[in-house]
Amino acid sequence: MYYRETMLAFVPYLAVFVACYGLVYYRRKRQRLPLPPGPPQLPLVGNLYQIPEMNPWRTYREWHQKYGPIITVKSGLTNTIILGSHKAARDLLDKRNRNYGSRPHFILIGDFIYGGNQTSLLPTGQRWRIHRRILSAFGNVRTSQRYRILYDAESKRLLREILHGGDFFEPFHHYFVRILFALTYGKRVTGSHDPEARDVIEIVDVVLKEASRSSVPEAFPILNSLPGALAPWKRRAQLLFEQHSRLFDNHMNAALANKPWNFCKQALRLKASSEVDRVELNFILGSITEATHSGSMVLGVFIMANILHPDAVRWVQEEIDRVIGPDRLPSFDDMAKLPYLNAYLLEVMRWRPITPGGMPHASFQDDEYMGYHIPKGTTVVANHWSMDFDESVFTDPYEFRPQRWIEDPNLPSIAFGFGTRICPGRHIAESSIFIVAARLLWSFNFDYAYEDGKRQEIDSWNMTQGLDSGPMPFKASFKIRSPKHQEVMDRECGVSDLDIDAILDKIGADFL
């Protein structure tokens, strides 16, 4: 009896010992696992000088083809694991989102330029959740539908500008600038050249340039401890932060004084807004107006595809003519009735991804995948360029084939990201892009531009460089499809003076 009681008393200690031994064994086993393979590295700099400044995502794809769907690239002292297949990205960034839903530490752009206030760069935690709740109130499905009255009005103005102007890149940018400034600040701006909008756009351009130079402090974090005299990026970044702060504060003050409804006023009613200070709230709301480039880049790719792939355009125009006819413009009520147009837009975003290099994620804890070790705190990036041209997922991936999305509705679209880090403004982007694309295809036929009888060729691989990547400027010909289409456009798009205040107040009434 005594022996049995002694043994029973020993059981809890034995269980703890076995658990500890198992944990140590598991950790040692995991530590013995290698990092994912990758190109040979040089001492100290790693692969820093093997990564080209132009189109680095193409180099990553070449490395994926050589080393596999998950590779390690070392920039200075920092390891980055790059994912090159849909399966790897879904397995880690979606299915294991709890471990990969954070962001790495962005020293230059995150800490210095944005003062730790940029939502998209924050690590997962309470602050990020507060930011996300505020932005979700602005851009969720329901609120985006409330904004359709504004998309409708501004898309008609866009058609008029293209009809009478000839250029399309600037009108596309004006369109998104007007929408986001009206919704956020209750301001009517004429477009990207408007002084109030230009200030934000110019500072974003500078930020993106600084971000592209951030490889030194990010690759060698120890340099962050240098005094300002030896780290000139710190002074530049501090000046940008001060410019940001003044600009966003001025816009917020003006928004609260403006008569019509705007989201700044709406945000102050949110409980989440009371959990951040005024400077932080200014940055959260200001980030909305910094997102004007992405939509215009998608529409630039859309026009390029229209010219280079006339057969695909004929298919979608036949669908539009069948559903809508020549007597009215397309509307949001038609969205569900235009599956080929929706497939066309999915293909536009796959064929030339505007975030080809993806956005960095970070691992919370040590992990194991495909027999490889992924250490805690590692930067993990989904290379959209590799994934969108993955032959195992997309047949003939370099071909522009919208019908692939009809044939297989389960094909993965990654344009807006992964997991909890999916773009909070995606519903606004989808709706505002859809209505413009539908109305452009209803209104115009598209062709190459000609100068002195010579066709102006378009290089579909000639894209801008940076965090976002859109087409380099090219010329195109827009021709009204028929006199009837012209008549409808004159009737529907002829009003030059929109009552933005009335539109915003109508949107605001839906929030009450």
From Swiss-Prot:
Binding-site list for heme: 423
EC number: 1.-.-.-
CDD domains membership: CYP64-like (cd11065)
Cofactor(s), names only, from the UniProt record: heme
Subcellular location per the Swiss-Prot or TrEMBL entry: Membrane
TM region positions: 6-26
Molecular-function GO terms, alphabetical: heme binding; iron ion binding; monooxygenase activity; oxidoreductase activity, acting on paired donors, with incorporation or reduction of molecular oxygen
Keywords: Heme, Iron, Membrane, Metal-binding, Monooxygenase, Oxidoreductase, Transmembrane, Transmembrane helix
Protein task: Cytochrome P450 monooxygenase; part of the gene cluster that mediates the biosynthesis of the alkaloid (-)-FR901483, a potent immunosuppressant that shows efficacy in animal models and a probable inhibitor of purine nucleotide biosynthesis by targeting phosphoribosylpyrophosphate amidotransferase (PPAT). The only unassigned enzyme in the cluster is the second cytochrome P450 monooxygenase FrzL. The biosynthesis of (-)-FR901483 starts with the condensation of two L-tyrosines to yield (S,S)-dityrosyl-piperazine.
Family, per entry: Belongs to the cytochrome P450 family.
PANTHER family: P450, PUTATIVE (EUROFUNG)-RELATED, P450, PUTATIVE (EUROFUNG)-RELATED-RELATED
Protein's name in the database: Cytochrome P450 monooxygenase FrzL
